[in-house]
A protein has these predicted regions:
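Enzymes that bind and transform nitrogen-containing heteroaromatic metabolites
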Residues: 2-184
Length: 184
């Protein structure tokens, strides 16, 4: 497989949970509602299956802070991947985490030219929107939580352009509906 083949096979994947009414966080940025309707009937390996093909993660600073301070304060869950955190705040890089003020479009465009495995777009909404508008997301994996928030941070808002996707999978596991879409 040549370098050009790797460019075409490395996918940019948005893997994210959303409420039934399309919010990725409540009006205060909280995500406690994610587990409110959890029903553990069977082993759900959806995330593990997805993440096993990832070597790069991209997120905004707010998402990074939520991951490191609330969700997993004792252990960075993406330590086995190269992380890019988009921020205007000056922060020292570590071996596996690059803090940058580059545009997410430039970062993804550069990464797609490099050999590697899939690129995981963690969030948040301000990171997702320009990637959608530039049609840089190859696959959308949405976990729909059966909760109506009524207000909050929307997954997609005021997107410019028209993007057609193809549904490739839908499944229900433990009261969560997983939808997968790929760009045409």
């Amino acid at each position: 497989m040549g370098k050009e083949d790797l460019y075409t096979t490395r996918k940019v994947i948005l893997y994210i949970a959303t409420s039934l009414d399309g919010f990725i966080a409540d009006s205060k940025g909280g995500i406690d509602w994610l587990h409110a309707n959890a029903i553990e009937r069977e082993t759900d390996t959806s995330y593990e299956d997805f993440y096993s093909n990832v070597d790069t993660v991209i997120m905004g600073r707010t998402t990074y802070d939520q991951v490191t301070e609330v969700l997993s304060p004792n252990e960075y869950p993406y330590a086995d991947s190269q992380s890019y955190v988009l921020t205007s705040r000056q922060t020292d890089n570590t071996k596996d985490i690059t803090f940058t003020n580059k545009s997410v479009v430039d970062i993804v465009t550069d990464l797609k030219k490099q050999p590697g495995r899939d690129i995981f777009i963690v969030g948040g909404a301000s990171i997702i929107k320009p990637l959608v508008e530039e049609n840089l997301i190859d696959e959308y994996q949405l976990a729909i939580i059966p909760t109506l928030l009524g207000e909050g941070i929307p997954l997609l808002s005021d997107i410019k352009g028209n993007l057609k996707l193809t549904a490739t999978q839908a499944k229900v596991v433990n009261n969560i509906v997983y939808h997968t879409y790929v760009k045409n």
